[in-house]
Amino acid sequence: MSGKKRTASSSRWMQEHFDDHYVKLAQKRGFRSRAAFKIEEIQEKDKLIRPGMTVVDLGAAPGGWSQVAVKLAGDKGKVIACDILPMDPIVGVDFLQGDFREEKVLDALLTRVGDAKVDVVLSDMAPNMSGTGGVDQPRAMYLVELALDMCHQVLAPNGCFAVKVFQGEGFDEYMKAVKEAFKTVKTRKPDSSRPRSREVYLVATGYKL
């Protein structure tokens, strides 16, 4: 019994230490969230965003990914962000608050994109977790399916897509759908992603539909 308690305690300590490290690092670098390190690491490996690009950031609040994206896209680039939660303004980011699952919010987002094709779609969306896998997983998969639908509507030929997906029911089918739409798909687990989390990031390049 004591062994089990000790294991749980050690695991909890590791998690807290891990979180504390990235939270402190985010504060030091002026990032709004530790999630900024995830897109930084993906960018370092996959070079998704370049100066002058147009980027859509779904599930953007509190703004960690948008901070990184706007810096990479530069003055001639464009970052359009959306979240159901409010987000403090970021210079160079066009933010729309609303529920991406609603048609009117999607329409408003498409209006902001305009006629220009998008180079990169980012999605760090996740549902409010209930702790019940049978409820949470379908909700999470619905969001990533909407993000892929967004790619089909706005992404330029050879465009890129980075999306957070939770491993579980529906993951394999979703991976297949992404592979059908892009030339290359890689699975990333950034160092800043919590070790025990089921989240992974699919990084897809070369949009071909």
Curated annotation (Swiss-Prot):
It is found in: Cytoplasm. CDD domains: AdoMet_MTases. GO terms for molecular function: rRNA (uridine-2'-O-)-methyltransferase activity. InterPro entries: RNA_methyltr_RlmE, RNA_MeTrfase_FtsJ_dom, rRNA-MeTfrase_E, SAM-dependent_MTases_sf. Pfam families: FtsJ. It catalyses: uridine(2552) in 23S rRNA + S-adenosyl-L-methionine = 2'-O-methyluridine(2552) in 23S rRNA + S-adenosyl-L-homocysteine + H(+). The keyword S-adenosyl-L-methionine applies. One of its GO terms (cellular component) is cytoplasm. PANTHER family: RIBOSOMAL RNA METHYLTRANSFERASE, RRNA METHYLTRANSFERASE 2, MITOCHONDRIAL. Belongs to the class I-like SAM-binding methyltransferase superfamily. RNA methyltransferase RlmE family. Specifically methylates the uridine in position 2552 of 23S rRNA at the 2'-O position of the ribose in the fully assembled 50S ribosomal subunit. This is Ribosomal RNA large subunit methyltransferase E. It comes from Shewanella piezotolerans (strain WP3 / JCM 13877).
